[in-house]
Amino acid sequence: EPIVASTSSFSEGSSVFGGSTNLVQSIETIFSVYEPEVIAVHTTCLSETIGDDLTQIVSKAAEEGKIPEGKQVIYCNTPSYVGSHITGYANQVAAMVKFFSTATLKKRNVVNLVAGWMEPSDMREIKRIASVMEARTLMFPDMTDVLDTPLTGKYEMYPKGGCTTEELKTTGDSKF
């Protein structure tokens, strides 16, 4: 599946002195070239080992004006020497909740379906079953209409579908 991904391009120097400069530059470049609403950053084995501090780096990028107004950078730690790819996926999903979920004390009769490591077809089936049960749900992440879609002959950098950031903000008010 075509997924837009970028790298901060560690060099020998950043391997020794840290990747802060590279990541701040990458954040600026990604926002200026690709114009996403959100950038999700995760660490690697090397950035974890040398001690890069994502909170500090993203704060620095914001202070320097590298994150445009209304845009967001979410992040999490995913050292490859802890757990597996599933652990990293779970950490990034937790970051989605941490950075977006808010509670207004107005409970919504909605069930949050937090999707674990699974295929888009499995997500689609879970949503279908919930629909048959007439349950109001919000699945996140939701890759059913973003990945596992028919070929149209036209490339879309950001396919329509999934859970929006506005929907993610409501998860703190869900009943379950």
Where are each of the predicted segments found?
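An N-terminal assembly and electron-transfer interface module characteristic of large anaerobic redox
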Residues: 1-176
